[in-house]
Amino acid sequence: QPPRRSSSAHREAQAEVIRAFAESLLRLDGGARVVVLGDLNDYEWSPGVARLGAAPFENLLLRLPEPDRYSFVFEGAAQLIDHVVVSPALARGAEVDVVHVNADCTDRRRSSDHDPVVVRLPER
């Protein structure tokens, strides 16, 4: 069981506010094209991130095979802390990849401590 960080309650509250806003957009328009993305500094299994990506939304990074499902390496541990959550209208036909060009490199050789996440979303 991973340790519970002191910031967890704040992250969960923030995720709940964002989730409520995204749900309100879907209530107004069931075909709304909603994207919530970024360096959330939290894992896919954390309560806040899991809530953001719960149905009907989808965390596209979870489509990747587990060995490729990371965007950051800290003290030798590969971690997924960057996320792309989309509404059903965007999930259909979406493509996602993480380009592992930074996280596996030494500090001197990389341009960032995170790998870039590439997402292709369907046109209307």
Predicted features by range, described:
Residues 12, 19-35, 40-124:
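Metal-dependent phosphoester-hydrolase catalytic domains
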Residues 1-10:
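Active-site His/acidic residue clusters
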